[in-house]
């Protein structure tokens, strides 16, 4: 199985600043020109919401302050500027092969 390691486990960011979350895969999730890494946001009592797919593509309806980058084994989610509604847990997930696996999550809090 591909193991996804997220860092940091939690972070506190002031309104208007940048939040950066990293995800490292135990082996490459990129092939044929695509990176099969995705980012989700989850708030209490709600299902995960897809933010970014294929490493850098913004899901429809997601604000442009969310962006993703990376390839191979190293990926990043950036949120800038952070808004109050962004307080949540963020997960990376790969779909390179079965089983699909998620990172352990990063909790974003507002200062």
From Swiss-Prot:
Disulfide partners: 23-92
Pfam families: V-set
Swiss-Prot/TrEMBL keywords: Adaptive immunity, Disulfide bond, Immunity, Immunoglobulin
Matching SUPFAM superfamilies: Immunoglobulin
Spans annotated as Framework-1: 1-23
Protein name as annotated: Ig kappa chain V-III region PC 2485/PC 4039
Annotated segments matching region Complementarity-determining-3: 93-101
Domain of life: Eukaryota
Gene Ontology CC terms, in alphabetical order: immunoglobulin complex
Keyword Disulfide bond: yes
SMART domains: IG, IGv
Gene3D superfamilies assigned: Immunoglobulins (2.60.40.10)
Region annotated Framework-4, chain positions: 102-111
CDD domains on file: IgV_L_kappa
Gene Ontology terms: biological process: adaptive immune response; immune response
InterPro entries to which the protein is assigned, alphabetical: Ig-like_dom, Ig-like_dom_sf, Ig-like_fold, Ig_sub, Ig_V-set, IgV_Light_Chain
Other facts: The PC 4285 and PC 4039 sequences are identical.
